Amino acid sequence: MSGKASGWRRPRGVAEVSLQSRVGDVRFANPIMVASGVAGHGTELASYVDMANLGAMVVKSLSSFEWKGNPAPRLHPVTAGMMNAVGLQGPGILRWKAEELPDLLATGAKVVVSIWGRSLEEYAQAAAMLADLPEQVVAVEVNLSCPNLLGKGMFAQSADLAAEAIAVTAACNRPRWAKLTAAVTDLVSIATSVRDAGAAAVTLINTVPGLALDIETRRPQLGNGPGGLSGPAIHPVAVKAVWDVHAALPGLPIVGVGGVASAHDVVELMLAGASAVQIGTAVFASPKLPGVILRDFATWCGRHHVISVDQLVGAAHERAAATDRPGQKDSQ
């Protein structure tokens, strides 16, 4: 099987499958990736997963400067998910290149670097620092959807600012994926804006803004106050975001992320329009999960006679067009 999962043996009755996927011009062995922020800078997973066998590893978001992040506590479990307010802690790109990247490259993983900034100038500086990276670093995910403006807003909530941030990051000399938020009134217009500014793909979605309170102390559970909700609770939100953007912009590659914990979730996002899928919060509970999902996904494809995973991308839209149910206006 082309691009097969490590340790995967094709069961009897399961068809030969090509797992190779593509996000724009970048090809991957398979569509299974680890999302930014759940495995540090990547090598932390090396003892649990054959990282060279995954589609890609997305590193924790980096800036052009060292950043200490938010006060503790930074994580809090909630029903069907987790709240976090880590605050983009990181060593800065120069230290990461010197201290973390060599070990990550040694695992054989394809690497996607996530960057952030508090201003357009800082996005541009971060991108320029990545221009000389080796070919194993295949793309740059421009994180526009954390509260990283000085006023704690998001670049991704403004079509104009999001487009400007993509435009100023061209110096990275790699395809740029714009990571967007579902916490907007018109996601399609923002996706259109970043595409027109040069984004090769969009990553949908980031965490959903939320707040958890301690009912005894009457204070927020997180040191920063509000935070981002992740995990199973946001999966349907991610599917809807991918669905809407693919329906409006079928030529724009999408990387789906949000509440992925099984091969079922991967298939669902791909049917909605994603070309690749990232696994996030679920890795905290089960660091071996990316490998498990990859094997289960390969088996599912074989049993459903999916010869190439490209067949899955947006396939539910064809069925929906026939039934004319999904995609109708929400009931009032």
Where are these predicted regions, by residue range?
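Conserved, mostly hydrophobic/aromatic
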Residues: 34, 57, 96, 113, ...
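Alpha-helix-loop-beta-strand connector modules within alpha/beta enzyme cores
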Residues: 91-108, 157-178, 222-254, 293-306
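Catalytic cores of alpha/beta
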Residues: 43-48, 123-133, 184-197, 247-249, ...
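Glycine/Thr-rich beta-alpha phosphate-binding loop at enzyme active sites
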Residues: 82, 144-160, 190-252, 288
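N-terminal capping/small domains of soluble enzymes
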Residues: 2-111, 116-117
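Glycine-rich phosphate-binding active-site loops on the catalytic face of alpha/beta enzymes
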Residues: 59-64, 139, 144-146, 201-211, ...
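Alpha/beta catalytic cores of nucleotide-metabolism and tRNA/nucleoside-modifying enzymes
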Residues: 1-15, 229-252, 261-332
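Glycine-rich beta-to-alpha transition loops that act as phosphate-gripper elements at the mouths
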Residues: 39, 114-117, 180-186, 235, ...
